[in-house]
A protein has these predicted regions:
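Extracellular/luminal Protease-associated
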Residues: 27-28, 34-50
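Active-site helix-to-loop segments that bind/position phosphate- or nucleotide-bearing substrates
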Residues: 4-9, 14-15, 57, 65, ...
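N-terminal basic/disordered segments at the start of proteins
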Residues: 1-24, 29
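Short, well-ordered alpha-helix to beta-strand connector turns
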Residues: 14, 21, 36-37, 58-59
Length: 305
């Protein structure tokens, strides 16, 4: 059971953050770290070794943010996984067919999640994306992912003139980028915890990207952020303010289904562990979670095929 619920947004806090006996002291208040899932640290915060050690002990992720409140780096601890060397070696030796098959499963799950997101938003073309998902081949040589993206983003916010752009500073792209950054930070900590190298990837390749595997494994979770951004816009949000940031971080705490206590956070952890077993040859097929709207939560993930 994943009991952690709280997200601490300290981007506006000015002062020292201390740690003592399992609790954070933030000014005059204290917060049990056992109840914390994620911390956002602002440029006016200061802290010492005690905080870092406490985060490691209670397995809490933290992001360091710039003056805009946008995460620019993360605090994470070294993996204590006893199979770290074996898994790094297995990643380096992973055969091309198995790597391509894993990427196929990831893209199929991402596309199905995007189709589910369009359904949840009452947008057209969900079935078109599902049809594309069924045509994905090993390694996605015909770039079905890109074809699906064009359909998806053209249907995402019709009538607003929206265009998905990773470097744009408009409100919608800013919200999406912020949510993806939070997601990336969580996947990074779970990749390392699973004893995996974040650099040895399946698909993403960039000489300057030390977290290429993280970018691979976060793909199926993107629709959870997309749907939250949609909900914020429907609720009247017109800026990336503190309330919007808190909502985007809260995506990690969404329940997986109506009758289980697993959250996006724990599903990410399970998925990274499954991927580690896959690269070691202990799984024949990589099972990838698929995002789907839940009746009891803003969004949910279900196990893939």
């Amino acid at each position: 059971m994943d009991t952690k619920r709280r997200v601490l947004d300290l981007t506006g806090y000015r002062g020292y953050i201390s740690y003592e006996r399992g609790r954070l002291k933030i000014g005059e208040r204290t917060v049990p770290l056992a109840e914390v899932d994620f911390i956002l640290l602002g440029q006016k915060c200061s802290w010492g070794y005690g905080l870092v050690a406490g985060l490691e002990r209670f397995d809490v992720a933290a992001a360091v943010c710039d003056w805009r409140g946008v995460p620019i780096s993360a605090l994470y601890h070294w993996s204590s996984n006893t199979r770290v060397f074996a898994r790094h070696e297995a990643q380096a030796d992973l055969s091309l067919p198995r790597a391509k098959n894993a990427w196929k499963q990831i893209i199929k799950a991402k596309l199905r999640g995007q189709a589910n997101a369009l359904d949840a938003m009452h947008r057209p073309h969900a079935e078109q994306i599902r049809t594309l998902a069924r045509t994905v081949k090993s390694g996605d040589p015909t770039n079905i992912e890109g074809q699906g993206a064009r359909v998806y983003w053209s249907s995402y916010l019709p009538g607003r003139g929206f265009r998905r752009d990773q470097v744009s500073d408009d409100v919608v792209n800013g919200m999406l980028n912020y949510g993806y950054t939070i997601l990336r930070g969580r996947v990074l900590t779970r990749v390392i915890s699973a004893g995996l190298s974040p650099t040895l990837s399946l698909f993403h390749r960039n000489r300057s990207n030390a977290f290429a595997l993280v970018d691979d494994l976060m793909e199926p979770f993107r629709p959870a952020v997309d749907y939250m951004v949609y909900r914020l816009l429907q609720g009247g949000s017109s800026e990336l303010g503190s309330e919007e940031k808190t909502a985007l971080v809260s995506v990690l705490a969404e329940k997986v289904s109506d009758n289980q206590d697993f959250t996006v956070r724990s599903v990410i952890e399970n998925f990274c562990s499954e991927f580690a077993l896959y690269v070691e040859g202990k799984r024949d097929t990589l099972k990838v979670p698929i995002w789907k709207l839940s009746m009891s939560e803003p969004g949910a993930l279900k196990e893939g095929e």
